[in-house]
């Protein structure tokens, strides 16, 4: 049975490629999802990708990942990263190895972006690498759960 990882993208990430391209670049959400599926497959993993603008739906998807025994979770909570205790608590509650990803370097931006509730629940955070951060997150997650790339 193939192990799965959940890749969750929060609010406004559906606008990748058109929203503030000087900050977020020109790659689209479809590009992110294709990159995640391709990278995960190198480790024998299936990437289950979701995007939602709703906080409660992110919490539900985290619970779903646990129920379906996902091997890991990669999450870009968008603006909810800086505000959502509920998402933090969901990650802590399910105890799935989690990597937080941000396309931009949140620490080089507005001060309110410097705090992340998700980071406090994740074993790692990547930011500022553009969509390449998702690939790096999968590499780190695979190492964390003991998987090597298939040749």
Swiss-Prot record:
The keyword Lipid metabolism does not apply. Substrate binds at residues 76, 82, 89, 103-104, 113. Transmembrane segments: none annotated. The active site is at 24 (proton acceptor), 102 (proton donor). GO terms for biological process: amino acid biosynthetic process; aromatic amino acid family biosynthetic process; chorismate biosynthetic process; quinate catabolic process. CDD domains: DHQase_II (cd00466). Disulfide bonds: none annotated. The record marks 19 as: Transition state stabilizer. This is 3-dehydroquinate dehydratase. Gene3D superfamilies: Dehydroquinase, class II. Homododecamer. Its EC number is 4.2.1.10. Keywords: Amino-acid biosynthesis, Aromatic amino acid biosynthesis, Lyase. Pathway: Metabolic intermediate biosynthesis; chorismate biosynthesis; chorismate from D-erythrose 4-phosphate and phosphoenolpyruvate: step 3/7. Pfam families: DHquinase_II (PF01220). GO terms for molecular function: 3-dehydroquinate dehydratase activity. The gene is aroQ. It catalyses: 3-dehydroquinate = 3-dehydroshikimate + H2O. Catalyzes a trans-dehydration via an enolate intermediate. It comes from the Bacteria. Signal peptide: none annotated. Belongs to the type-II 3-dehydroquinase family.
